[in-house]
Amino acid sequence: MTQPQARCLILACGNTLRGDDGVGLWLAEWAERRFAEHDGVRVIARQQWTPELAEDVARVESVLFIDCSVDSPPGSVRLTAVEPAAAGQGIATHHSGAAGLLALARDYYSSLPKTAQLLTIGAGSTELGEVFSDAVQAALPKACKMIEETVLRFPAL
């Protein structure tokens, strides 16, 4: 029996060996448990977003990207709309950001999700280690709540 096509993709990245950089993967595991009974939601967790993921992005109605941010205050949780990178803008061949993946979906699969959001959690430390900073640890409940609310608001869910 084939699984139904997901309408919503949660695409998280991070590195569990670099402190707060692993928060995206932790949140992906949480989302897999939270939406396990929800046929319309698919979760993919990777160390990096690679161009191959553009096909997955092109096949859904909504996508939620999750990552840490070294440019935001530690423990801050932000949700922003994401637009595809402009045509002709350089897109890395080994790893891509959210805007780059949307551009690849548009350019190579002629399809874009109706809704694309990026949830970032400000990193306090990306030093070697598997423990989150106090700021990121304290932000986890807020991040989980924002993921849940965002996914349940997506069209067709």
Residue ranges of predicted features:
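Helix-loop-strand module that forms the ligand-binding subsite of alpha/beta enzymes
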Residues: 68-116
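Conserved active-site and cofactor/substrate-binding residues in soluble primary-metabolism enzymes
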Residues: 22, 26, 48, 96-100, ...
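Non-catalytic beta/alpha edge segments that cap or flank active sites
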Residues: 2-4, 156-157
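Nucleotide and nucleotide-moiety/phosphate-recognizing core
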Residues: 3-11, 16-84
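Short alpha-helix boundary/capping segments
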Residues: 19, 89, 93, 131, ...
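Predominant activation on well-ordered alpha-helical scaffold segments within soluble catalytic domains
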Residues: 25-29, 54, 99-102, 144, ...
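Phosphate-binding/catalytic loops
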Residues: 101-157
